[in-house]
Curated annotation (Swiss-Prot):
Protein name: ATP synthase subunit delta, chloroplastic
Any one GO molecular-function label of the UniProt entry: proton-transporting ATP synthase activity, rotational mechanism
Major subcellular location class: plastid
PROSITE patterns, per database record: ATPASE_DELTA (PS00389)
Species: Ochrosphaera neapolitana
Amino acid sequence: MSVAKIADAYAEALLELANSNKSLKETTNDMNIVSQFLANSSDLKKFLGNPLITRERKKNVLKDVLGEQISSVSLNFLMLLVNRGRVAFLDKIAQKFLELSYKQDAIEIAKVTSSVALSAQQQKELAGKLKLITGAKKIKLALRVEPKLIGGFTVEIGSKLIDTSIRGQLKKISNLLGA
């Protein structure tokens, strides 16, 4: 089974659970925390994906790291993923859940990667411009800092990519010159 299908299945199941428990907002917030945590900690991602580490150890680390920050329902979901050997896909599952949750509320997710952290004002202006471009009622920014971009940022909304980074511009110039 492909990673996308696995992520879809678990994300849909969690969405159904959150809707039936009337805890969609809380679960969405929890998955946002999980997603941001994984985006900022490549060590945790590697740890969870390592098949040599026992399930018990993975559970203990997840409880220690996220136990105080997320609801018991979300934590139990993470434990289920560990038990079923699917915790390596947690990042994709959380992203898919957020997409489904936001789509249900007519919110577009924009994955923004910038060379430096964006200020609150920059985030607000970017969200406003993306709202105009997409026609969405609301834009949710998923922020990530990637110094390799040199300058500027990239925005990914659905299958569209807007690349204003210096690295992207240098790549275009390189392709034009045939280097």
